[in-house]
Amino acid sequence: MSKVYDWFEERLEIQAIADDITSKYVPPHVNIFYCLGGITLTCFLVQVATGFAMTFYYRPTVTEAFASVQYIMTEANFGWLIRSVHRWSASMMVLMMILHVFRVYLTGGFKKPRELTWVTGVVLGVLTASFGVTGYSLPRDQIGYWAVKIVTGVPEAIPVIGSPLVELLRGSASVGQSTLTRFYSLHTFVLPLLTAVFMLMHFPMIRKQGISGPL
């Protein structure tokens, strides 16, 4: 085993990386509220795992979506547990994200030199809200249908570009199969990819700049 470790150590300097991670200074004023960002990340990872598991059974069509969700909840092995964890974790992720934003704002964590960290965090917050909107429509039940109809109808109040923007969101003049396909693609591919990209920007900046000092 030591030979294998030595082989990787010689090429990747694993020990130096481990020392850098474990020896990072943590300011004495840090408390449990500084863990909210990490909890949000944990919820996101749970979302990815449980969401991926449900893709094996979910069918993104207007005629089969609701039935496939029922199948997950009543017949698929541990499907009820996986979907329930997905829903609970989604709510927890939104709550932790909101509390994290408040904590950063109230402690001045957005000030120089952490402006870009704040900007990427705000983008991650918008992406989190987008997860909620797109995911809400996927069961294709009454609540999801009307929620999507209302949300996608909001831009119609914008002069000139309102109607084309609504049609772009829905894929047609009304909420239908094109809307479900768009939201499913956004929820399972586009948003997770964008979230991962901005997280890869967000965390190294925190690592580089460290935790902000007390007020």
Swiss-Prot record:
Disulfide links within the chain: none
Protein name, UniProt field: Cytochrome b6
Alphabetized UniProt keyword annotations: Chloroplast, Electron transport, Heme, Iron, Membrane, Metal-binding, Photosynthesis, Plastid, Thylakoid, Transmembrane, Transmembrane helix, Transport
Record-level GO cellular component terms: chloroplast thylakoid membrane; membrane
Classification via HAMAP family: Cytb6_f_cytb6 (MF_00633)
GO molecular function, one term: oxidoreductase activity
Biological process annotations from GO: photosynthesis; respiratory electron transport chain
Organism this protein belongs to: Vitis vinifera (Grape)
Subunit structure: The 4 large subunits of the cytochrome b6-f complex are cytochrome b6, subunit IV (17 kDa polypeptide, PetD), cytochrome f and the Rieske protein, while the 4 small subunits are PetG, PetL, PetM and PetN. The complex functions as a dimer.
Gene that this polypeptide is encoded by: petB
Cellular compartment(s): Plastid, Chloroplast thylakoid membrane
Residues binding heme c, per UniProt: C35
Keyword DNA repair assigned: no
